[in-house]
Design a protein with these regions (language model features):
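Short beta->alpha connector loops at strand-helix junctions that form conserved
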Residues: 90-92, 116, 137-140, 197-198
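Short acidic loop-to-helix transition motifs that present clustered carboxylates
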Residues: 118-120, 179
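Glycine-rich beta-strand-to-loop/alpha-helix junction loops that act as flexible
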Residues: 174-177, 195-199
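Conserved N-terminal beta1-alpha1 strand-loop-helix module at the mouth
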Residues: 1-88, 94-96, 103, 111, ...
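Internal catalytic-core helix/loop-beta-alpha segment
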Residues: 110-114, 118
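Generic enzyme active-site microenvironment
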Residues: 33, 173-174
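Acidic, divalent-metal-coordinating active-site segment for phosphoryl/phosphodiester hydrolysis
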Residues: 177-189
């Protein structure tokens, strides 16, 4: 399977969001990754539903929505109305994770669970069969452009072992510090989907960068 690429809108030029999304539409990107932050669960505020709704109207790629917020279960219905393909929630933010995953599925979306860098893969043992994707944070969440946390490679390998052992069909997505040096190692370790923000949007030729990531 070709590596999937989900460029992160957080790194886009928000003064020219229209043209940035047109570029994504033209590109070989598989999805568009949308980071929603509340300033409580993570130390930053990004954007909310007015921006999400505007992006959804323009973007022709499936929307991969990542909630870095407290009580993400409160926004399942609004996320469904956007037409989102995937709703990612943090293990650390959900008191009743199994119920939240069920509710996401009942709303007609795929359900992803996200682990912060310090959270072990073992937290997923009793939920791995129920999720469509696991998103591993390879930087501490909240800000783009951070340095890649090196032990993510071993974490991907452990997650791949867990998925293969359980027979789960969950994809492995990586978010943070994805660039030309880390991306091949992540794919070799077992990653299926790469989220790339500044590496794509900060490039002189973002469409070529997306193409190159997909051919790893």
């Amino acid at each position: 399977m070709a590596t999937m690429v989900s460029p992160s809108l957080l790194a886009a030029d928000f003064l020219h969001l229209d043209s940035e999304i047109e570029m994504i539409n033209r590109s070989e990107a598989d999805w568009l990754h949308l980071d929603v932050m509340d300033g409580v669960f993570v130390p930053n505020i990004s954007f909310g539903f007015p921006v999400l709704e505007a992006v959804a109207r323009k973007c022709t790629k499936p929307l991969d929505v990542h909630y870095m917020i407290v009580h993400p279960e409160h926004y399942i219905e609004q996320t469904r109305k956007l037409g989102a393909m995937m709703m990612n929630v943090h293990v650390e933010a959900c008191t009743h994770l199994h119920r939240t995953i069920q509710e996401i599925h009942q709303a007609g979306m795929k359900a992803g669970v996200t682990l912060n860098p310090a959270s072990p893969v073992s937290l997923l043992e009793d939920i791995i069969d129920d999720v469509d994707m696991v998103l591993l944070m390879s930087v501490n969440p909240g800000f783009g452009g951070q340095k890649f946390i090196e032990n993510t490679i071993q974490k991907v390998q452990r997650l791949r072992e867990l998925i293969d052992k359980s027979g789960s069909k969950a994809l492995i997505e990586i978010d943070g510090g994805v660039q030309n040096e880390t991306a091949p190692r992540l794919v070799q370790a077992g990653a299926d989907v790469l989220v790339a923000g500044s590496y794509v949007f900060g490039s002189k030729n973002p469409e070529q960068v997306i193409h190159d990531l997909r051919t790893l």
